Amino acid sequence: MSANRHPVPLDHGEINALLAAQWVAPDALARPRDHWQRRLAVVVPYRDRAQHLRTFIPNLLDYFRIDKLDRNIPLHIHVIEQADELPFNRGRLINAGFALIGDTADYLCLHDVDLLPIWADYAFPLHPSRLCWYGSPNSQQRHLYIGGVTAISSADFRTLNGFSNDYWGWGYEDHDLRLRMIANGLKAEARDGAYRALPHPHNGLTADGGESETGRRNRERIETLHREGFTAWQRDGLNSLAFDHIGSAPLQIEGRSVEQATLHRVRFA
């Protein structure tokens, strides 16, 4: 396995400082002239959140219809449903969505189903961009994270080899993505979007607020990969993805097809 293009520091203080320093401010003037014509695929990893989905889809489509800037973006929503009994795997679902979408999108917005935009900037990203700032968890250390709502060009997603396929259950797949960005020298853009979070269980915590078993397991996994030099991303991601595509169809909300949304059902072996 070849070395990373850019070294990933082993010291936690160093890596936190590097993560904080990598953020850049949005520069609308630097965006390509045709950025409003770039095709956007909103990718929503999903399972067992029917009520959230019924709220999220109309809310997002209404937002794009009303917003004076984002209304011009060619948009399609892809809900990627995990239809098996295995633990939820957000990263693998997003990878599967990217594989199914193919060349129909110029950039992606990786969107949790429980975050509703109040104000946000969904324009084409020059760098992988965290859209959710206000209303996001971990507000005291949010410069370290890129989860929740993330815009990334299809080219950058390929460069990173997508997400890891091996974070089962809650957490740390987005931390892994940030380390992939460091290894490839990609900066992160911080946009100041405001979102409303729908109520949902925090599966990384136990009832008394302690770390859950899945949270501990995934934390230990990324810590091990980090200690080993974090080169595993080169063989774990889009190039190692395996899934069964059960089928795709127009998304149904309240018995009606949603023209700008497709439901893709997949399962993992």
Task: Briefly describe each language-model feature range.
Residues 1-21, 56, 166-169, 175-269:
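C-terminal catalytic/acceptor-binding lobe
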Residues 19-32:
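A short, compositionally biased domain-edge/stem linker segment
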Residues 31-37, 49, 55-73:
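Short, acidic, metal-binding catalytic loop of nucleotide-sugar glycosyltransferases
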Residues 35-40, 128:
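A short, charged/proline- and glycine-enriched loop
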Residues 44-45, 54, 69-84:
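Short beta-strand/loop segment that forms part of the nucleotide-sugar
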Residues 85, 89-94, 98-100, 107-111, ...:
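Conserved catalytic core of nucleotide-sugar-dependent glycosyltransferases
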